[in-house]
């Protein structure tokens, strides 16, 4: 049922078929690839497919995830493909601690896992990690997705409120998550869970 997931929830998911681990970049992010500017931070990178996609295009990419197992898998993929991505175990609520600054942050399914307090920390960290004029592209579960399984559903107003100060919201558009076809733990909407795909820019002044 809908809840704030714990680290153990994600650890257990990687023992089986994690619904979000589709083995490639989500199509919604591939569609905006020409807008993604280096250097890039993939926040909540999982097993690394999106970070590796952009590294293959020649971009400088850092990927962080809270758990060691997906980072281990991501590093193995990078080695197999001879791609250079800086994969790290890290806490996305502490992005201000990073020494680098980025022109793009990518978030595929991270925003919706936070408590209200951690979400505020995350957004504040995004502002610190991004260069002025940099963009965040994020996709999260929408309140239009029925049922109780999975992460919190996020409303359009919650997104607007989260990025009200110091940000320019460029778009909030309905979209869909693609899911791992081997995952059988729940049923989502036909065509994939309903989402919001969001583009926000850190204000230059």
Language-model regions: role of each:
Residues 1-41, 47-100, 114-129, 134-205:
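Class I (Rossmann-like) S-adenosyl-L-methionine-dependent methyltransferase catalytic domain
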Residues 109-113:
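Short catalytic micro-motifs in class I SAM-dependent methyltransferases
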Residues 106:
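A conserved beta-strand element that flanks and buttresses the S-adenosyl-L-methionine
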Residues 103:
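Conserved acidic residues
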């Amino acid at each position: 049922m809908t809840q704030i997931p714990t680290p153990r929830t994600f650890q257990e998911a990687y023992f089986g078929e994690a619904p979000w681990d589709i083995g490639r970049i989500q199509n919604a992010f591939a569609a905006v690839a020409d807008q993604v500017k280096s250097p890039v931070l993939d926040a909540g990178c999982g097993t690394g497919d999106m970070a590796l996609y952009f590294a293959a295009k020649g971009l400088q990419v850092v990927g962080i995830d809270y758990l060691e197992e997906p980072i281990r898998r991501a590093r193995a993929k990078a080695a197999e493909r001879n791609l250079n991505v800086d994969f790290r175990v890290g806490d996305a609520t502490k992005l201000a601690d990073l020494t680098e600054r980025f022109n793009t942050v990518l978030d595929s399914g991270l925003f919706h896992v936070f408590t209200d307090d951690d979400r505020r920390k995350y957004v504040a960290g995004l502002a610190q990690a991004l260069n002025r004029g940099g963009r965040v592209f994020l996709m999260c579960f929408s309140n239009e997705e029925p049922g109780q399984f999975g992460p919190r559903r996020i409303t359009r107003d919650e997104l607007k409120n989260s990025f009200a100060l110091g940000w320019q919201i460029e778009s909030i558009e309905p979209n869909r998550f693609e899911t791992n076809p081997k995952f059988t733990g729940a049923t989502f909407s036909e065509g994939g869970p309903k989402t919001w795909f969001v583009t926000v820019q850190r204000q230059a002044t």
